[in-house]
Amino acid sequence: VIFYFREDLKEIIKNLNLFEKNNLGLNLLIATAPIAIAGFMSKDFIEMNLRSEDVIFWTTLIFGLVLIFSNNLSIDQKNLNQISLRDSLLIGSFQVFALIPGSSRSAVTMIAALLLGYTKYDAAKFSFLLAVPTLFLVFTSELVDLSQESTNISYFNLTYVASISFLSAISCIHILLKFIEKIGFVPFGIYRIFLAGFILIF
């Protein structure tokens, strides 16, 4: 994500203004805040209570249906130049649902952006950009946990996984953005419904 959007991220960092309400960098920080707070407060609860097949089935099914519903409701009027603090906070609040096993971070943030009136392309782009600070927090948290649990961390394995993820992301993001812009989110919603059925059967 960082590599693909490197030019966008350079501009975001360069133009970061904490006093300009439509500033994209500020709005990405605002959108990250809810999951940072919720993740810190609920991590142990989620680990102990929500990692079950039933939870994964229902979240997979529900967010698939909501993705189709929000795609059909989308009015495609706003772009990222019109992003507001209110919208960012709402999108970030939706992102908290990504903490529930079976949900998708990108799906819930795209759903929120669509319901707020953003174009399909900009909903997807904001979701991808939001992944940068969000996944940085997740990676940092996991790294801290690993360092506390064991001194035998395989940095080779971490590097290998990161490299595979990097190559996969580069090959997929461009295709996904073009696909979403032309087709929308319905195929992804249908995929989640079929996946929920697979989970239920097996």
Features from the language model and the residues they span:
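Multi-pass membrane proteins that catalyze or facilitate reactions on polyprenyl-/lipid-phosphate substrates
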Residues: 1-202
